[in-house]
Amino acid sequence: VFENSNGDPDSPANWRASFGKGGTPGRPNLSGPEPLVILNEILAENVTAISNGATHPDFVELKNVAGTNVYLQNWSLSDNPAKPRKFNIPAGVVIKADGYLTIWLDDDHEAPGLHAGFAMDNDGDTIALFNPAGERVDVITFGMQVADHSIGRSVNGWVLNQPTPGKANKNASVADLKKLRLNEFVAAARAGGDDWVELYNMA
């Protein structure tokens, strides 16, 4: 179901599974319980932006929107929604009310923090958050990423950010969309070739 009336209907971030099996065709969408914790920021191509230990790993940031502390034991994170238990958050991890939790996407357990043991594809991937019952709480599918820039949740969906693990999101400076032009395309490629579209940034 489409859940963000101000968002882009072409963005997967603005859609979620229905709360009722089979959906509600021809009727208003069912509302469900508000999530306690959400995906808030993702950095999938960390070249030099943020270090953790001696390396620059990718990360996922969670945000507590419940207004009270949430114990995250047996919550899980995965880049494959069919395998929700790729990384189980260990016992004793608490995310404070209105707080943030950074999970590093590597296996360097000598470095500070939590480490998921898997990485994301900077050409596009999916990341999903599951509660202890194995129910999907939040998910985002994203495309090709910009080096050293994260994507962060905003009131209008997900936008390009400056990486801020453990802190409030900070939008990155971007050009006016009016400066973007359709510059060239091929609609009838030769045999074995692909059609394509080229965009040009005039800014």
What is the predicted function of each stretch?
Residues V1-A203:
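Intrinsically disordered, low-complexity linkers and terminal tails enriched in Ser/Thr/Pro/Gly
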